[in-house]
Amino acid sequence: MATGDRVQVILECTEEPGTSRYHTTKNRKNTSDRLELMKYNPVLQKHTLHREKK
């Protein structure tokens, strides 16, 4: 049985760290570098850049 290449990651807001976090999965084979996505921050009430946390 294959172990798979998908791994769970945490995305954290860069503008206000600690206020908004998202959990998602990514494929390590296709995206070896860290994810950066624009996601909604409910505390700031706007879309902000979220980066993959170590």
From Swiss-Prot:
The keyword Ribosomal protein applies. Pfam families: Ribosomal_L33 (PF00471). It comes from the Bacteria. GO terms for molecular function: structural constituent of ribosome. GO terms for biological process: translation. Keywords: Ribonucleoprotein, Ribosomal protein. SUPFAM superfamilies: Zn-binding ribosomal proteins. Signal peptide: none annotated. GO terms for cellular component: cytoplasm; ribonucleoprotein complex; ribosome. Coiled coil: none annotated. Belongs to the bacterial ribosomal protein bL33 family. NCBIfam families: PRK00504.1, PRK00595.1, rpmG_bact. This is Large ribosomal subunit protein bL33. It comes from Salinibacter ruber (strain DSM 13855 / M31). The gene is rpmG.
